[in-house]
């Protein structure tokens, strides 16, 4: 082996760099542990929110202080956080969201809210098409506009030929030119949204945030590992920062309308309860409009508006208030429906014609602990345009009022100052409201005109964090359009911590099993392979830390798979060396041949390249967990090759040079798989029948039963909910049917006191409050099982006690992005198959080899799908078909190809050496000679995967089950499917030659 010194130097330096990079993770966790201990001392109770505040204070206090001194250099806590290894949400907890900037809103803004019928009909048609299309909203709008336009052009003065765009869009400009301009404007708006969101996130206070644009889709991905206050995060990233100042009606001006509305609601409900359902459909529909999905006459106790809304009645001048009523937080959606009902709105007097009702931004607690939200009556107008808007704000900052309460101080420009002075002059003795994103933050009485352009937002319940966030969004600027969360994953820190513990336990056990097996099977050579394996693991984690890559649960699975591949490389080499020794060649010659291209190296490189190609395709087309898996897989392939080929070689060469006794077997493994001569091809028809029967059974199951699609493929919401006792999933599903209107999927998740609840309830509805309303519906539905747990404690976010009730993790996927995820996953599968087909064709120069490999892969995938279809209904773990499952399928593809390529490489070698043999004999002998390697590698890989499956977290069991089935089937198919099909598709004359 040449350049031993250089390889040693490189390995030592690489190892030291890896240790150096990983040290930051160690030091960072030590500081965070100190912060947690400090918080526990300051807050002796189990109040997770208070503890989080003190933790943050401690970390802020040491952020710029020296916490590590390495003599030659030192580091602050901020320095450490920048350099430590990033953990994904599934290991650390936090929020991962994909936001869709509303292109529709941007188009409406560019048209100055055009009332052109063709324009608005095209927007509506594009909305409908978007639900079932993977195309962009803008392209769909163009297609629909051209269908409806006839003679109308996009440059029409009533559409985009406006004053604001006249410098860019000329009169009678062609549609093609206008399309290009609109695309530029949309891109500019999305860039603005990206900059605004990045500015907000930078000031949020989490370490290692990540924000990136997703191609030209108008989507922005935000990752906030470790974020605990989920409600605060979602408000920060979805807030449009639309600040408005409005005049407000007093309670005295609205109360008579409320009394009339109350009577009307009572009348409608009474009519419904006394009418015959089959004859009075219209009235039933009216009730459905009012009560929505919860309408059930058996549940209504008091049949009027005031069942849900508590009016604030003014009987004299002293009782005048801007607060017109209150409602329980969980009843606000009901009040909204009632007040939006057409028959109720028809009762509005002329002076209240344009009134709009907005809620306070934060609930207050009544004397009995009930959370109540205040309702305000805003004096709107025909155009719904506020007298003063946020564009007049020059600066905003968090300060404290004279009463030492947190507030947001704002400074207006000259124009805004004049408008504010005018507004406060005209409304002396009345009320004005400061509204942010349709929530009222303050609605004080105006005592005198306010001059100078300074004002403040000072809600009585505002915290310092909330005031800081409001100042942040106001300074960062207004989003050009609504940013809707189309996919969000929330993992509570408790679940993340448990996932880390389970993952590293299973990881440690898996490694220990592999190390023991290699030593038991190969003796001293196995010990050298173990050392190389340990170096390989160090290199993988060192590279992840160096490049600030994110480690996730699927990423850990990727590392473990590469460990299996690293073992495979050593097994191939050792088996070749054993062959040389069996042929009475010297140890030195056998080692040299084993590590040569003509020996094991060719098969190792071919096998790893096919898996690498799969990893690249996964990384290009995959998202989320698939990307994390692909990244660790690709890194692991590189380090596995280096350690197996060079580190193991260095150790073995050193032993050979010193004349040490070197064994490649033990008393246990001696003689295994030697002198085998199995006639595989004679049994191929039996294999075809067995495989065909299994695949047919799977296809019948898929056609009749189907597969359980996860929310990332079909859209919906899934909640992982923990209870303080064991739960019956069927009973909970039946209970929730009443709350959601249809039966959700409920399954035990991990332990018997944890359930995964999946529902499509209100997934099509839009609006910033929908997610909150769905969570509140879930809370109400589960109330019989969670006792006195408050809604705030039930929601996801802060760390929960081991047996506390509440949402541990939450995921939502909009149906529009679900289609995109499914499409990209299918492209990943077919793309990897195509690339591998071409690579095998290039390497082996025969179509029959490619055909055999690809058919075997299809065989493996179909069997895994069939097993999932047949077993998902009764298996005690989650078996959803989603992104992680696709990652598992592609891993099966990679493993199966790896196995097949090693065998094909041996067939090619034997065909070149044994030219006098029949082709069938060549194939059988080649298969027999590689059987030891095939079984050994499969056994160690299955050993590793079984350890993870048994001891890993609940979130990875379905993933590992697919891999276990795939590896077992892949081993079988490489022997009994790929090779026989390759043989049967090889032309007769080629066999004879």
Predicted segments, located by residue:
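Short helical (or helix-break) motifs at transmembrane helix termini and adjacent helical loops
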Residues: 562-583, 604, 641-646, 890-914, ...
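Juxtamembrane "pre-transmembrane" interface segments
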Residues: 223, 456, 461, 465-509, ...
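Interfacial segments of transmembrane alpha-helices in multi-pass membrane proteins
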Residues: 2-4, 408-409, 413-428, 432-433, ...
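Pore- and gate-forming transmembrane helices of large, multi-pass membrane proteins
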Residues: 197, 494-514, 533-534, 585-623, ...
């Amino acid at each position: 082996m040449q350049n031993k010194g250089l390889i040693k130097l490189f390995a030592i330096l690489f190892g030291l760099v890896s240790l150096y990079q990983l040290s930051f993770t160690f030091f960072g966790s030590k500081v965070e542990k100190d912060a947690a201990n400090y918080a526990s001392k300051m807050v002796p109770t189990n109040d997770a929110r208070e503890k989080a505040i003190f933790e943050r204070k401690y970390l802020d206090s040491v952020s710029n202080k020296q916490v590590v001194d390495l003599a030659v250099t030192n580091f602050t806590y901020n320095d450490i956080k920048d350099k430590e290894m990033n953990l994904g949400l599934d290991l650390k907890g936090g929020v991962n969201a994909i936001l869709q900037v509303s292109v529709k809103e941007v188009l409406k803004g560019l048209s100055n809210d055009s009332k052109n019928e063709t324009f608005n009909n095209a927007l509506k048609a594009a909305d409908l098409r978007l639900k079932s299309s993977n195309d962009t909203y803008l392209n769909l709008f163009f297609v629909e506009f051209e269908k409806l336009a006839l003679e109308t052009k996009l440059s029409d003065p009533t559409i985009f030929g406006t004053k604001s765009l006249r410098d860019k869009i000329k009169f009678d400009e062609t549609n093609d030119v206008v399309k290009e301009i609109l695309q530029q404007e949309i891109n500019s708006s999305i860039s603005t949204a990206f900059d605004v969101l990045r500015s907000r996130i930078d000031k949020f206070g989490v370490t290692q945030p990540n924000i990136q644009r997703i191609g030209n889709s108008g989507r922005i991905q935000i990752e906030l590992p470790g974020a605990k206050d989920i409600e605060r995060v979602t408000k920060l990233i979805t807030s449009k920062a639309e600040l408005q100042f409005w005049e407000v009606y007093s309670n005295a001006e609205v109360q008579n309308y409320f009394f009339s509305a109350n009577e009307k609601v009572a009348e409608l409900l009474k009519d419904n309860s006394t009418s015959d359902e089959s004859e009075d459909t219209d009235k039933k529909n009216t009730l459905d409009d009012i009560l929505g999905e919860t309408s059930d006459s058996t549940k209504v106790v008091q049949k009027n508006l005031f069942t849900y809304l508590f009016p604030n009645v003014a009987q004299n001048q002293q009782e005048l208030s801007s607060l017109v009523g209150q409602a329980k937080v969980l009843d606000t959606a009901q009040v909204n429906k009632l007040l939006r009902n057409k028959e109720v709105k028809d009762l509005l007097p002329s002076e209240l014609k344009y009134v709009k009702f907005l809620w306070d931004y934060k609930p207050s607690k009544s004397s009995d602990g009930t959370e109540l939200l205040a309702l305000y009556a805003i004096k709107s107008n025909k155009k719904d345009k506020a007298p003063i808007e946020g564009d007049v704000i020059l600066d905003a900052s968090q300060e404290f009022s004279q009463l030492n309460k947190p507030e947001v101080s704002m400074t207006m420009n000259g124009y805004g100052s004049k408008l504010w002075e005018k507004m406060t002059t005209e409304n002396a003795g009345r009320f004005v409201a400061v509204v942010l994103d349709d929530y009222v933050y303050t609605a004080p009485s105006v005592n005198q005109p306010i001059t100078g352009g300074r004002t403040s937002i000072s809600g009585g319940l505002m915290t310092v964090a909330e005031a800081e966030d409001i100042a942040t969004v106001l300074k960062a600027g207004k989003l050009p359009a609504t940013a809707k969360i189309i996919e969000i994953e929330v993992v509570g820190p408790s679940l993340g911590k448990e996932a880390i513990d389970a993952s590293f336990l299973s990881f440690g056990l898996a490694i220990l099993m592999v190390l023991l097996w290699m030593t038991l099977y190969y003796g001293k050579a196995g010990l050298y392979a173990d050392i190389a394996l340990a170096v390989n693991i160090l290199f993988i984690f060192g590279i992840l830390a160096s490049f600030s890559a994110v480690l996730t649960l699927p990423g850990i699975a990727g590392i473990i798979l590469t460990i299996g591949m690293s073992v495979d490389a050593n097994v191939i080499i050792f088996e070749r060396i054993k062959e040389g020794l069996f042929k009475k060649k010297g140890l030195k010659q056998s080692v040299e041949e084993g590590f040569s291209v003509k020996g094991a190296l060719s098969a190792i490189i071919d096998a790893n390249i096919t898996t690498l190609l799969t990893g690249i395709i996964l990384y290009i087309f995959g998202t989320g967990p698939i990307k994390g898996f692909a990244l660790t897989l690709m890194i692991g392939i590189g380090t596995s090759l280096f350690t197996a080929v060079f580190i193991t070689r260095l150790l073995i060469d050193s032993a050979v040079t010193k004349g040490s006794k070197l064994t490649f077997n033990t008393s246990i493994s001696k003689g295994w798989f030697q002198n085998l001569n199995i006639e595989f091809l004679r049994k191929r028809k039996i294999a075809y029948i067995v495989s065909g029967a299994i695949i047919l059974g799977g296809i019948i199951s898929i056609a009749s039963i189907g597969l359980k699609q996860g929310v990332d493929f079909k859209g919906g919401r899934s909640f992982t909910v923990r209870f303080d006792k064991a739960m019956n999933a069927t009973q909970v599903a039946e209970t929730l049917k009443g709350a959601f209107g249809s039966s959700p999927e409920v399954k035990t998740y991990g332990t018997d006191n944890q359930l995964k609840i999946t529902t499509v309830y209100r997934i099509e509805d839009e609006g910033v409050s929908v997610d909150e309303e769905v969570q509140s519906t879930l809370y109400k539905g589960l109330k019989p099982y969670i006792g006195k747990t408050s809604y705030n404690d039930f929601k996801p976010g802060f760390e929960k006690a081991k047996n506390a009730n509440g949402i541990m993790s939450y995921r939502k996927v909009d149906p529009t992005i679900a289609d995109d995820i499914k499409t990209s996953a299918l492209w990943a599968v077919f793309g990897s198959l195509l690339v591998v087909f071409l690579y095998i064709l290039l390497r082996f120069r025969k179509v029959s080899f490619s055909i055999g490999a690809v058919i075997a892969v299809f065989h493996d995938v179909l069997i895994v799908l069939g097993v999932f279809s047949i077993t998902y209904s009764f298996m005690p773990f989650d078996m959803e078909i989603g992104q992680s499952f696709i990652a598992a399928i592609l891993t099966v593809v990679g493993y199966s190809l790896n196995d097949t390529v090693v065998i094909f490489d041996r067939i090619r070698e034997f065909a070149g050496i044994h030219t006098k043999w029949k082709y069938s004999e060549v194939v059988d002998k080649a298969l027999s000679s590689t059987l030891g390697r095939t079984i050994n590698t499969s056994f160690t890989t299955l050993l590793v995967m079984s350890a993870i499956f048994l001891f890993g977290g609940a979130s990875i069991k379905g993933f590992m089950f697919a891999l276990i089935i795939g590896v077992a089937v892949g081993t079988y198919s490489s022997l009994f499917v790929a090779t026989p099909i390759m043989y049967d598709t090889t032309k007769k004359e080629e066999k004879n030659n």
